[in-house]
């Protein structure tokens, strides 16, 4: 249901009520906490009810029977909802708590990455950079890769003159996209292009336009943005991301197996050092008809809602 471009609100509300009924019947416990998280996600990202999501997550955090890691995950969820609602500092506080409590755990690394993004959105690029430095050596390849990409974006686009205005534009657009304010985000990206034509952020702008089109389920348009990125910026750090995302678009959304295979093959041969190679190889072999056990490797998540 939530995978539809415009899911009927009445059906989403009915789904929410069924989840509420199940939790009420079984009681809120460690066994039903995942259902509470799902319900909070539904409220925040599909029913435009972040306040309702906050109330649910706070109820879960207050539950005395859940383990520390589950409580930390609930705090991350709550931080995400606060960020969605525009409460950046509440989000940062929650991320900081998880970072402090799980400093040497993957949860702590994820919390620090999210906190670095908050600093990035707020325009505090140097502080974001300081947080990212530690994460580059994370044992999670995805976290380390995300930290490296954001760190390089800051380094490459501040420039020797330390002009942070273009990057501030982009950070604003990215935050608006995260908050589902897509038209506003696109308007900021347009303004960035007009004010700073030919800026080094050109590849990032195209990738952001792809993420917005994907979130709106406009898959042909999304594929167009990725194709343009690959044509105009063939040596950029986002190329492997773009190739994997484009292959998945062809495979899962546009039902074009031939183009999907060609895109995965290009990633395998042109981006041999990418962390996405294992997933691309698995997907390529599956489409080729090889006998593989298990689903494709979930190495790279789809763009955020």
Positions of predicted regions on the chain:
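Acidic, polar-rich low-complexity tracts and alpha-helical solenoid repeat scaffolds
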Residues: 1-305
């Amino acid at each position: 249901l939530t995978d539809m471009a415009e899911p009927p609100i009445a059906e989403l509300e009915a789904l929410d009520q069924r989840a509420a009924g199940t939790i009420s019947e079984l009681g809120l416990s460690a066994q039903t906490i995942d259902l509470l998280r799902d319900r909070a996600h539904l409220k925040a990202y599909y029913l435009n009810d972040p306040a309702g999501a906050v109330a649910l997550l706070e109820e879960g955090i207050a539950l005395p029977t859940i383990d520390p890691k589950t409580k930390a995950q609930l705090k991350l969820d709550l931080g995400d909802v606060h960020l969605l609602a525009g409460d950046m500092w509440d989000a940062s506080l929650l991320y900081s708590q998880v970072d402090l409590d799980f400093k040497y755990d993957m949860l702590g690394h994820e919390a620090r990455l999210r906190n670095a993004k908050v600093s990035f959105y707020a325009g505090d690029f140097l502080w974001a950079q300081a947080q990212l430095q530690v994460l580059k050596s994370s044992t999670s390849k995805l976290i380390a890769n995300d930290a490296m990409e954001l760190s390089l974006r800051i380094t490459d686009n501040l420039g020797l003159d330390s002009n942070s205005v273009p990057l501030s534009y982009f950070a604003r657009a990215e935050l608006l996209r995260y908050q589902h304010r897509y038209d506003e985000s696109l308007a900021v990206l347009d303004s960035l292009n007009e004010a700073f034509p030919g800026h080094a952020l050109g590849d990032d702008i195209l990738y952001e336009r792809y993420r917005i089109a994907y979130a709106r389920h406009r898959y042909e348009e999304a594929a167009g943005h990725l194709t343009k990125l690959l044509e105009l910026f063939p040596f950029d750090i986002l190329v492997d991301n773009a190739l994997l995302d484009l292959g998945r678009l062809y495979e899962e959304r546009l039902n074009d197996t031939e183009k999907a295979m060609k895109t995965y093959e290009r990633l395998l041969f042109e981006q041999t050092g990418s962390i996405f190679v294992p997933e691309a190889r698995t997907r390529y072999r599956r489409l080729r008809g090889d006998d593989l056990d298990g689903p494709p490797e979930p190495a790279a998540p789809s763009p955020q809602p």
